């Protein structure tokens, strides 16, 4: 039963970089919840990106407008703008060709750092 839970409900991973410091230290273990329900600004999520699996914080949700470093973003339906807490050392929405991550690419919502 525990194995089934970790295949379908929970996700254990690690933080691959310094991009979420000081909240999450590089290489620290994290626990995510797969049937994450509603996502809100401020939630930390684990998601797939064309360059790998990342851990970032939701900066803006579908339908929201946000200004980041002088640039205004309008978040489309079913998408999110994601940023690392360590803005000086984070490869995130600010640098991607398409700055938005669609909800289907979100794997889990962080439960425990």
Tell me what each language-model feature is.
Residues 1-113:
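Extended hydrophobic leader/signal-anchor segments used for secretion and membrane insertion
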């Amino acid at each position: 039963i525990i194995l089934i839970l970790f295949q379908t409900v929970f996700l254990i991973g690690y933080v691959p970089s310094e991009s979420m410091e000081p909240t999450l230290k590089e290489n620290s273990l994290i626990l995510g919840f797969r049937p994450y329900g509603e996502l809100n600004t401020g939630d930390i999520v684990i998601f797939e990106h064309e360059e790998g699996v990342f851990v970032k914080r939701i900066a803006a949700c579908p339908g929201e407008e946000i200004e980041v470093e002088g640039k205004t973003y309008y978040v489309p339906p079913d998408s999110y703008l994601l940023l690392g807490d360590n803005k000086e050392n984070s490869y995130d929405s600010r640098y991607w060709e398409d700055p938005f991550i669609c909800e289907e690419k979100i794997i889990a919502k962080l439960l425990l750092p």
